[in-house]
Swiss-Prot record:
Source organism (scientific name): Haemophilus influenzae (strain PittGG)
Keyword hit for Signal: no
GO biological process: menaquinone biosynthetic process
Catalyzed reactions: isochorismate + 2-oxoglutarate + H(+) = 5-enolpyruvoyl-6-hydroxy-2-succinyl-cyclohex-3-ene-1-carboxylate + CO2
Cofactor list: Mg(2+); Mn(2+); thiamine diphosphate
InterPro entries in the cross-refs: MenaQ_synth_MenD (IPR004433), MenD_middle (IPR032264), THDP-binding (IPR029061), Thiamin_PyroP_enz_TPP-bd_dom (IPR012001), TPP_enzyme_TPP-bd (IPR011766)
Official protein name in the record: 2-succinyl-5-enolpyruvyl-6-hydroxy-3-cyclohexene-1-carboxylate synthase
Amino acid sequence: MSVSVFNRCWSKVILETLVRQGVSHVCIAPGSRSTPLTLEAVRLQNAGSVTCHTHFDERGLGFFALGIAKATQSPVAIIVTSGTATANLYPAIIEARQTGVNLFVLTADRPPELWECGANQAILQQNMFGQYPVANVNLPKPNADYSAQWLISLLEQAAFQQKQQGGVVHINVPFAEPLYDATDEEVNSHSWLQPLQRWLIQKKSWINVEVQQNEVLMHENWDHWRTKRGVVVVGQLPAEQAMGINSWASAMGWVLLTDIQSGVVPTTPYEDIWLANQTVREKLLQADIVIQFGARFISKRINQFLQAFKGEFWLVEQSGKALDPYHHSLTRFNAKVHHWLRAHPPLRQKPWLLEPLALSKFCATFIEQQVGGNLTEASLALRLPTLLPYNGVLFLGNSLLVRLVDALTQLPESYPVYTNRGASGIDGLLATAAGIGIGSNKPVVAVIGDTSTLYDLNSFALFKNVTQPTLIFVINNNGGAIFDMLPVDEQVKDQFYRLPHNGDFSQIAAMFDLKYAHPYTWADLNSVVKQAYSRRKATLIEIKTNPSDGSSLYKRLIEQISHAVIGA
C-alpha cells in the first residue's frame, strides 16, 4: 500500500467530515508535513465545497479564522504544519475558547517514531493546547487497520462536543513520508474508501443527531419579581438577540445598562460616565433584582455595580459557561434572550428611578462641550456612528479607544459590533478584522490602537483579499495610552508601560499596498471616508493624537460627573 496515497485517503475523510459539520472556510499556512490535508482542501475548493485562505503567519492565520467564524457563525478549519507553527495558534485558540467560537485546528505532525529522538521539526503536539480545546483528537499515523467509519465517528463525536459547548477541536494528524506522490484517481479508487461511497455522494453526516429544543418556561415567581424595582444589564450578545430588550425594559420601568457590544440602544446613554456618580449608584444599588443578558462588560463602572449588588440576580445566557465573575447567588437561564423575553411578559409601570435619565441628559450636553470639535480619540468615539456604513460591521480593538467608544458612542439598534473580549489581548486584532470582512462580505470599520497594530503588522497582508470597502482606523497616540489610567510615576510609565514608538504608519501602508490617509480635521476625515467607501479595498486611516489627550478627557469626565448634583 502506498503511504502517500493512504495519507491522502485519511485526509480526505477528515476534510469531508468537517464539511458535513458546517465548515465552508479552510485557512491554510504553508508547510510540507501538512501537504495531504492541504491538497484535500484544494480538491474541495475546486469542487465548490469550501473556500481556502492562506497566510504565512500562523498566529495571524488563527485570528483570521476566528474572525471568519465570528462573522459566519459557522466553524472554520485551520491547517498548519508541524513544529512551532502549531504553537503560534495558541492565542487564537484561547480567545476562541473564552468566547465559544468554533474552530477545527488540524495540526500535521511527524509520525510517532520521530518523536523525542532529535528529529527535525518534531515537538510534542498531542494535547499541546491543554484544556483550551473542547476536544483533543490525537489520531494515529494513517493505518488501514482503522476503518474509515471509525475515523468519521471519532471526529463527529468531537464535533458534537463542540456544538454543545462552543470552542475549539484540536485534531493532531501524524503523517509519515512520502507526502506528494498520490493522484486523485488513486485516492478515489482506494479500497479503504469503498464503504463510504454513499456517504461521499449524499453529503450527510455519518451520525444524525436530533437536537431537542428546550422550551423556555416562565419563572415560577415572575409575577412577583416583575412588580419590583429592577435593573437590566446587557453585555456582549449576538446581534439577532438584541431586538426587543430596550422596549421590554422600558415597559417595565426598569433601568437599562448596556455595553457597546450588546447591539441594544440605551435609554440612558453614557452609563460608563454617569455611573461614576455616587448618589445615583447608591440609589441604583437599592434595586430588588438585576437581570443580566450576555456578559463580558467593557465598562469598569458597570462591573463595579455588578460586583456591589447583593440582591436577587438572574443571568440569561445561552452558552452554559460560567459568566459571573462576582459569584452571585443567582438564578440561571440557559436560553436565547428573545425566547426568554417571550416567556416573561413585562408589567407596564412607571420608572422607579428617574435620576439616571436626568444625569444621562446632562452628560449629553456636558460631553459634547468637553470633547469639542477637533479630531481626537474622544471626538472619533463620540461621532463614530456618522462614519459607519448602513449595511456594515464595526470591529473594536482592545485599547483606550474601546473604552471611549463604550462610554460615548450610541450605535443604531442591532448594529453588528465585533470584539476580542474573551482574553482581551492586543494580539491578532488586525487579522480578526480581516476575517470578519471576508466572513461577512460587508463593509468593515475597524478601530485599533497603535501598539496593537504594531503587534500584528503581518496581518495587513490579509487585507489584499477583501472585496468590500474596509476602513482601518489606527489611533496613534504614540504608545500604550491606556496605561495613563494607572497610578504610576510618569517616567516609569513611559519606560515600562506606554513604550512610545515615535513612528507613523505611512510606510507600513505602502509596504502592504494599502491606501493611506492621515486626516488632521473632521473635514479631512469626512472626505477620506467618502473616498474609502468608493473603493472595494482596504484603506488605512491614521489618526494622530497627543498621547495623554484621550485618557485625560476620560478621567476628567468621570471625575466631574462623579460630583455632579442633578435633580430628577
